[in-house]
Amino acid sequence: MTELSKYRNIGIFAHVDAGKTTTTERILKLTGKIHKLGEVHDGESTTDFMVQEAERGITIQSAAVSCFWKDHRFNVIDTPGHVDFTVEVYRSLKVLDGGIAVFCGSGGVEPQSETNWRYANESEVARIIFVNKLDRMGADFLRVVKQTKDVLAANPLVMVLPIGIEDEFKGVVDLLTRKAYVWDDSGIPENFEVQDVPADMVDLVEEYREMLIESAVEQDDDLMEAYMEGEEPSIEDLKRCIRKGTRTMAFFPTFCGSAFKNKGMQLVLDAVVDYLPAPDEVDPQPLTDEEGNETGEYAIVSADESLKALAFKIMDDRFGALTFVRIYAGRLKKGDTILNSATGKTERIGRMCEMYANDRIEIESAEAGDIIAIVGMKNVQTGHTLCDVKHPCTLEAMVFPEPVISIAVAPKDKGGSEKMAIAIGKMIAEDPSFRVETDEDSGETILKGMGELHLDIKVDILKRTYGVELIVGEPQVAYRETITQMVEDQYTHKKQSGGSGQFGKIEYIIRPGEPNSGFVFKSSVVGGNVPKEYWPAVEKGFASMMNTGTIAGFPVLDVEFELTDGAYHAVDSSAIAFEIAAKAAFRQSIAKAKPQLLEPIMKVDVFSPEDNVGDVIGDLNRRRGMIKDQVAGVTGVRVKADVPLSEMFGYIGTLRTMTSGRGQFSMEFSHYSPCPNSVADKVVEQVKERKAAEAKK
C-alpha cells in the first residue's frame, strides 16, 4: 500500500474546451497508464468513455483514474466543464483534496471556469493553476494571470514563465531553479532539454522570481526576517513555504504549457507532488446526526480508525453496477460486511477495483485516502455513508440543486415501457440532479434536469445505451407559485355519519414567507383549544398542499402558516380530522392571498467578439434579460445578465449565428421572480390546453 503522505486525490476542472480532458490524457501518458494518446477531437480520450462524451467532445461524468508519479499515487478525476453538469463538479469536489484549474491561454477566465472556481472555494479545495494552449493564436500567459486576479479575486503565484508564444512556444523557465525546459516539436513529452535562461528573459525571470520569493516567505516569519536581511532561502525552504500557502489557499501556484503539444506537463505533475495536500493534511470530514446537524465528531483520516466512507457516484457500465467510494477512515477488505447508515441495511463487499477510466484492476483491500469502485452494491445512492457495523455514523450529506427544466417522454411501443422504467431507475441512481415523475393526469413520464443539454444527453442514453425508442415532448419550464398578501382565516371540518364523527376547527394566518424559505409552520395557540398532539397533523395538512398551487397547479414557494387558535371535540377530534381541516383551509385561503406565478431566472454569462456585442445585448434584452455587467477583454466582451429560463431555449444556436460560431455562454439557476401578467396568462392558457388535450386521449 502507498503511505498516506504520498496520496494525492485531485480533480481537473475548467471551462468547456480549456483542455481538461487532454490535460488528463497527458498526465496518464506521462505516468505510464496509457500507451497511445487519445485526442478529444478524435473522440478517443481515455476519461471521456461514454458514447455521448466522445461524440460531443465534452466530459459529462467524472471519470476516476489512478496513476503514479515519483512514488506518489494520484487519484485523478476529470470533471465536466459544461454548466448543465456542474453537479458532477460539485460531487467531485466533495471527495477531492486538491485540484488543477485549467484555463485557456487565449480565452482566459471563461464563464464556466468562474462557476467551478467558486464551487472549489466553497469546498475549500487547494489548487494549482495550469494555463493551457499557449501554442494557440492570441495566447498570453500574463494576461490570463491578471484575469485570475481581476475576475476570480484569486492570488496566483507565478512559478514559470513561457519561452516564446503561439507558434513559437518552446517551453518554460522554472523560476525556482532558474532553469529553462525546452521541448522539440515531436510532440513526445520526454523530448526536452534543460538549458540556461534565454538571455532576453533574464531580467523578467529575476523580477518574477523575486515576487515569488516574497510571497513564499510570508508563510514563515523566520525565513522572512532572514530574507529581509539579505539571505536568500534555499529551494527546499521555498517549496515548504509554497506548500503551506497552497494548502491554506493563500495563493495558487501557477504554471503554463500546451497539453496538446506535450510541453510543460512534467512541471505540473511535480507541483501536484510538491504543493497539493495529502488526505491527512486537509480538514477532516464532519459527522452529522440524522437531521444533518454536525455532532462535533470527525472522520479522522487514518487506517486505524473505524470505517467511514462516502459513496459519491453510482455508475452502470459494461462491467456492471459500480459504486465509487472515497474512504475517509479505516480499512475495507473484500468479503467485509459493512453498514449503509442511510438505509440501516448491511452489505457484503464483493469485488473492489482501482479504476483506470473504463478499465479496472481488482484489489483485495483499500484504506483511508483511497478512491475505489465497488462492484454490485445494492440499495446504495450518491451521498450514502458506508461504515463499520459496530460503529454506525453519518458523513455530511451532499445537497443537489432542484431541476429547472422538464420534458415528457413515452416509449414508441408498449413493450418499451418496462425497458424504459429499468433504464430510468439506473440513471436516477447515477445522477442525483436528474429526477423523474409521473404526471397524475396524463400518466406521462416527466424527465427533469438542469438544462437542455442535460436532458438531451439523458434522452440519448435512453435511446442508444438502453435501446428505448422514445416520443419526446417540448421542454417545459419549472414554474412556481407564491402568495403576495396576508390572510387571517378559519376553517371547521365536521362530519357526522353515525357513531363517532370527525371534528377539527382551526384559526390561522397565511402570510408570504422570506425568499427561499419554502414552507414554514408555527403555532401560537395558547391553552388547550387545539391540543399539541394535533399540531403536527395541521402542519402535515398544510405542507401536503404545497405541491399544487391554485393558479396553474405548480408547486407553491415561500409561504408561512401560523396556527393561532381553534377548537376540538373530546370524542370526534383526531389527527386525521385536523389534517383534513388544514388541507381544506389551504384551498380556501390561498386564493384570497393574491397568488402569483413565479418563473426561474438564470444567471447567464455570455462571451462575444467585440464586433457582435451590440447584437448579443439587443437579443438578451428581447429575451426579457436584465444586463448586470459588461467586461471588455482582449479577445472579446463578457456580458452578464439575468434572463428568464423560458426565453433561453435554443439560445446556443442564435448565439452561434450572431457571432459566426465564436460566441460562448454558460447559464445557471439564480432565483425565482414574479412573471409579468402577459407571460402568466400565456402559461395558464398553455396548462389548460394541455390538460384539455390529455382529457380527450
Curated annotation (Swiss-Prot):
What are the alphabetically sorted keywords of the record?
Cytoplasm, Elongation factor, GTP-binding, Nucleotide-binding, Protein biosynthesis
Protein biosynthesis recorded as keyword: yes
Superkingdom per UniProt? Bacteria
Cellular component, GO annotation? cytoplasm
Q: Which Pfam families does UniProt cross-reference here?
A: EFG_C (PF00679), EFG_III (PF14492), EFG_IV (PF03764), GTP_EFTU (PF00009), GTP_EFTU_D2 (PF03144)
Query: CDD domains from the entry?
Result: EF-G, EFG_III, EFG_mtEFG1_IV, EFG_mtEFG_C, EFG_mtEFG_II
Binding annotation for GTP: 14-21, 78-82, 132-135
Q: Where in the cell is it found?
A: Cytoplasm
Ranges for domain tr-type G come to 5-280
What biological processes does GO assign it? Answer: ribosome disassembly
- Provide the GO MF annotations for this entry: GTP binding; GTPase activity; guanosine tetraphosphate binding; translation elongation factor activity
Do you know which NCBIfam families this protein is assigned to?
EF-G (TIGR00484), PRK12740.1-5 (NF009381), small_GTP (TIGR00231)
Record's family?
Belongs to the TRAFAC class translation factor GTPase superfamily. Classic translation factor GTPase family. EF-G/EF-2 subfamily.
Tell me the function of this protein.
Catalyzes the GTP-dependent ribosomal translocation step during translation elongation. During this step, the ribosome changes from the pre-translocational (PRE) to the post-translocational (POST) state as the newly formed A-site-bound peptidyl-tRNA and P-site-bound deacylated tRNA move to the P and E sites, respectively. Catalyzes the coordinated movement of the two tRNA molecules, the mRNA and conformational changes in the ribosome.
Q: What is the protein name for this chain?
A: Elongation factor G 2
